[in-house]
Amino acid sequence: MRGFGLVVLFFVSLVVAAIAMFPLSQALNLMGAKSKGLAYERAYGTIWSGALDQANYIGQPLGRVSFASRPLSLLSGALSVDFRISGQTADGRGQARFGMGGVEIANTTADVNVQNINNLDARLRQSPSTLNISIKSLKLSYAGACRGGRSDIRTDLLTSVGRQWRWQGPAMTGELVCVDERPSFDMRNEGGADQITAQMTLNDRGGYLAQAEVRTQNSDVIQALRALGFESRGGAFVYEKQSVGVSQAAARPAGRVEEINYED
């Protein structure tokens, strides 16, 4: 029986090794990655450890994306993969854990160059600014549903954009939360006399719904808000903008929403 067990273990090892050595480029072709919005100049390595050069997701350049699996993590019932993104839009690294119930993004940090986010309102990209993301845990189903998480985010977007209107905009801080099973950046101002809240909810097509509300009596701030597309409504200045991503959304949020469609 011991000899039979060794034979079984040998063949199982061969199967695992064969799967691990499967070329990344062929795996992406079988998955139809390009039809789902993922483009790249070249794929290296295997599905176990590899990289993509000049990666692009739904029209957004990512640069080089690399990953390496941790074989021993399988003993815990989940496969852990270390990843790195390096490009003009973002520089970050972290870990993804693939288990029976879905994916967990953990121990991830990234600095995002807001000026290079193609889908974002051009008025918010006129001055250089950064979005700093620190994800302790973000749980997603394999269908893409957001299940919860813990994170910290910070941006100097308003500080950068406000300078041209003599407004020292505050830093915005917050967290990445789940809204209707979708990841959402929920932020508020850090200090200052004005009351500012902002939320950007992502969809599974690479689009988003951005909403913000500002309460202020500062004339310089009001001038800046109007130039950025805010509307006076109920004693506050309100901003809403939607990018539906790669396909038209069946339903649209109530209110005045500007829509951008980035279909290929």
Regions found by a protein language model. Give the residues of each.
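Short, solvent-exposed secondary-structure boundary motifs
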Residues: L28-S35, Y57-G59, D82-G87, V161-Q168, ...
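Solvent-exposed beta-strand/coil patches in large extracellular/periplasmic or lumenal scaffold regions
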Residues: S127, N132-Q199
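N-terminal beta-strand/beta-hairpin edge segment
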Residues: L38-S127, K136-L138
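Hydrophobic membrane-insertion alpha-helices, especially the h-region
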Residues: R2-P23
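Extended terminal
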Residues: F4-V7, A33, W167-D264
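Alpha-helical transmembrane signal-anchor/signal-peptide segments
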Residues: L24-G45
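Short beta-strand micro-motifs enriched in acidic
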Residues: A68-L72, R97-G101, A143, V177, ...
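Transmembrane beta-strands of outer-membrane beta-barrel proteins
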Residues: V81, G149-S151, A210
